[in-house]
Amino acid sequence: MNNIHNHKILILDFGSQYTQLIARRVREIGVYCELWAWDVSEADIREFNPTGIILSGGPESTTEENSPRAPEYVFNAGVPVLGICYGMQTMAMQLGGLTETSTHREFGYASVNLKAADALFAQLNDDVTSSQPKLDVWMSHGDKVTRLPDHFQVTAMTSTCPIAAMSDERRRFYGVQFHPEVTHTKSGLELLTNFVVKICGCERNWTPENIIEDAVARLKAQVGDDEVILGLSGGVDSSVTALLLHRAIGKNLHCVFVDNGLLRLNEAEQVMEMFGDKFGLNIIHVKAEDRFLDALKGIDEPEAKRKMIGKVFVDVFDDESKKLTSVKWLAQGTIYPDVIESAASKTGKAHVIKSHHNVGGLPDYMKLGLVEPLRELFKDEVRKIGLALGLPAEMLNRHPFPGPGLGVRVLGEIKKEYCDLVRLADAIFMEELHASGWYYKVSQAFTVFLPVKSVGVMGDGRKYDWVVSLRAVETIDFMTAHWAHLPYDLLGKISNRIINEVNGISRVVYDVSGKPPATIEWE
């Protein structure tokens, strides 16, 4: 079996919004990597034993006295180092060079001229018509390197940035002022491949097939003949977790599927058919709609609704786990961004951005060991593994659905009537997006129930019924988003179908808010 962790890249995070993109690109190349805080200890770096190190960009200025610095050991570890943007600047400063605040800041597209051929830029050229090789890149910096450290050479420049890239080939230290990790940099992936594969010498063992083989072997070693319980939601993460565990331990996996009354139309039936009938998983189907809706009566504040939904889920899950007296392990679909965001890194420096629905939250007295087979994986990697395990592409590529489900898509107090209405309206919305070819053109689309009534006309009579809002957005990273410009005739068709086919809805509106200032979900 290939050792998928034998060659690995350490990425030190200086706070760039693009840092996770670096990790995803390295994984895409086929090499394992981890993302750690910039002030990681020498002992941790030695223990990780990286094949190469990448220093990310960041919002700070190297000209400030207390700005972040890479650990000195990074430059004494004997492995190649690539500094990106701020990473290049701190490399230059720490090795004896000089940086200054630029009078001309560069943000956006730029063309860099390659001055010297080094291993990083080998075979790269975005302008074959020019006598001098050029790259189309994405810049985002206010400082610049003005004096090179000893033994470095300038390898690229722009009209306003004389040192756009530098290298010390003897020590295998490289710096680029632009961002190769973003798709706007045309040959960015090729540049990173040059660093990771050619300079660091990493083998490309990080593939879906190898990851599955490694995960199954590790699960067998961790769990043995013990029994495992998993909350199966039908979402991508829990589904892939279930199939990996099923491959490793078979019937010793007990999946608990909780129908809380807040799911999409026919979702419970689809989950049972897919995982019970097709894959043969051992599934406990808990019909708990009344229990959830009773607990949510009178609660209209979004965070209070989330917490109550989470509490009732834990109670239901706990009730089921007590019936399984032989269970020793709890499986969760925690993925790598959850680990990064939830203060679970080795350095303890990461700060909690939000509480994730599947990180923690179960009673301490359950005394179960934790199994998290996806905790090293990004979402796109989980999807690729799901595909390799036999999950259908349409399920893996379905738009995101929040953990609390319709609980945050029914504004205000949650009632069964409201859930039923928004469920039917949303099914029509999705059906028409699929039929028109727009479903995969947008990043996320859904329907929101508004707890207000509006007058309408049906035949010769007037009716006073509820309002729903359609929401569709386009985004790359879900950090920012644009509202999707769906064709008017498509919106008109969806609106007419909802009003005519869903008894109780008299008006359909379309949300044209971007993020920021609005969030993608309404609650």
Curated annotation (Swiss-Prot):
It catalyses: XMP + L-glutamine + ATP + H2O = GMP + L-glutamate + AMP + diphosphate + 2 H(+). This is GMP synthase [glutamine-hydrolyzing]. The keyword Manganese does not apply. HAMAP family: GMP_synthase (MF_00344). The keyword Signal does not apply. It comes from the Bacteria. Pathway: Purine metabolism; GMP biosynthesis; GMP from XMP (L-Gln route): step 1/1. Residues 8-205 form the Glutamine amidotransferase type-1 domain. GO terms for cellular component: cytosol. PANTHER family: GMP SYNTHASE [GLUTAMINE-HYDROLYZING], GMP SYNTHASE-RELATED. InterPro entries: Class_I_gatase-like, GATASE, GMP_synth_C, GMP_synth_GATase, GMP_synthase, GMPS_ATP_PPase_dom, NAD/GMP_synthase, Rossmann-like_a/b/a_fold. GO terms for molecular function: ATP binding; GMP synthase activity. The active site is at 85 (nucleophile), 179, 181. Its EC number is 6.3.5.2. Homodimer. ATP binds at residues 233-239. Catalyzes the synthesis of GMP from XMP. Keywords: ATP-binding, Glutamine amidotransferase, GMP biosynthesis, Ligase, Nucleotide-binding, Purine biosynthesis. Residues 206-398 form the GMPS ATP-PPase domain. Gene3D superfamilies: 3.30.300.10, 3.40.50.880, HUPs. It comes from Pasteurella multocida (strain Pm70).
